[in-house]
Amino acid sequence: MSEMLVLDGLTKAYNRGRPGEVTVLRGATLSVGTGEVVALVAPSGAGKSTLLHIAGLLDTPDEGRVAIGGTEMAGLGDRARTGTRRREVGFIYQFHHLLPEFTALENVVLPQLANGVSRRGAEARARDLLGRVGVGAREGHRPAALSGGEQQRVAFCRALANAPRLLLADEPTGNLDPGTSDQVFGVLMDLVRGTGLSALIATHNLELAARMDRVVRLEAGRVV
């Protein structure tokens, strides 16, 4: 299996060299194979959000290397890194962060327009994705008119709008009640499997973690 994501020896500290320095990652190393879904299990404060931000090129490590799809990120300038992030990586967070003034459809269309997709093509893909997660009939509703589970399904579609090869998710169902969480996670897994994505999904829920291909644990900034 080829590797879609490689994180090798990541170290990250905030306020480095100053009073109040906090080391968040201490040589964290992991990989995600092509088409593999990996659970990242970590207690609060272990550094999982920082690790995901570095993996998604939203932050840089103090030490260590990041490779996406076989390309080393260290040699890329800011513009190239931004382009790689937009093309290759989709993000899902615990809270949906949908734009409240736009409909469900527009929330999935807009990221595509920003990447140069025609409106016609963007709307067609958005409708396909919304239909696949069971909220196609709600495409004209704004986020406030949707249930929590529906909002998160739209967020899944937005994350996949530009057909990334790598999905990073930080507690994607953590804001939902247990019953809804289980159902919505099933929708996410069907979507990931159906598109052949590689995914690194952080969760506290060991039952959800067990449904993925492999589980890695992050403790005190280290993968154990």
UniProtKB/Swiss-Prot annotation:
Residues 5-224 form the ABC transporter domain. It comes from the Bacteria. It is a peripheral membrane protein. It comes from Cereibacter sphaeroides (strain ATCC 17023 / DSM 158 / JCM 6121 / CCUG 31486 / LMG 2827 / NBRC 12203 / NCIMB 8253 / ATH 2.4.1.) (Rhodobacter sphaeroides). This is Lipoprotein-releasing system ATP-binding protein LolD. Belongs to the ABC transporter superfamily. Lipoprotein translocase (TC 3.A.1.125) family. Keywords: ATP-binding, Cell inner membrane, Cell membrane, Membrane, Nucleotide-binding, Translocase, Transport. Its EC number is 7.6.2.-. The gene is lolD. The complex is composed of two ATP-binding proteins (LolD) and two transmembrane proteins (LolC and LolE). Part of the ABC transporter complex LolCDE involved in the translocation of mature outer membrane-directed lipoproteins, from the inner membrane to the periplasmic chaperone, LolA. Responsible for the formation of the LolA-lipoprotein complex in an ATP-dependent manner. It is found in: Cell inner membrane. Its main location: membrane. Signal peptide: none annotated. GO terms for cellular component: plasma membrane. GO terms for molecular function: ATP binding; ATP hydrolysis activity; transmembrane transporter activity. The keyword Membrane applies. ATP binds at A42, P43, S44, G45, A46, G47, K48, S49. Coiled coil: none annotated. GO terms for biological process: lipoprotein localization to outer membrane; protein localization to outer membrane.
